[in-house]
């Protein structure tokens, strides 16, 4: 895991704000339509000490593009490691593209009765999910322009067969940040805070597989070349973008980030 970084000593000050409006292009029913994104608050601060902006978020399996749009602009990511595991969420699944449209990749875990800390959730290797995931990825992205370049990194992590879901997701998140060439340090919580500090952007539960519209608070889809069909599928796992666009992935994620976080 990355080394811990010490934040610079500073005081956070509330300051006047102003609004800007962004116009974005969306593909709807095969047509490009222009929509106005929500107003974005820009912090117009008085000169003073620098305050690190922290993006607090839960850990996901091969996170979607909106995940990275949400944390883009922060100085650091803080992973919520003190939460309880929530079933049927992105914590153990992702969405990819295929010849049959969007499909999920679900990581089976060993279930326990009652509440289980996310760090204590074990992976279930009685099911051959790694081989199944890998075959599905090869079938879906084998012809993608950058699959052969990036796939070995993913293969190496999956086939390590680590014990815990959190550990797997941590390594995959680090891999994705490396692909984007983002030098954003990853930290972790040591207590669950209902009300985080004022310099913390609380993104916990902001990205919900069952409430996709929530993502549009900070994410608007930017179209890119995809492997299948003429209809663009938005907000898939970052691996879809990376396998299809390679080094351009970072600029596409940045362009999709609506809620610019100001230091």
Residue ranges and their predicted role:
Residues 5, 19-20, 35, 50:
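Short terminal hydrophobic/aromatic SLiMs and anchors at protein ends
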Residues 18-28:
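Short, composition-biased linear "edge" segments at structural boundaries
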Residues 30, 40-44, 48-263:
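Residues lining hydrophobic/aromatic ligand-binding pockets adjacent to catalytic sites
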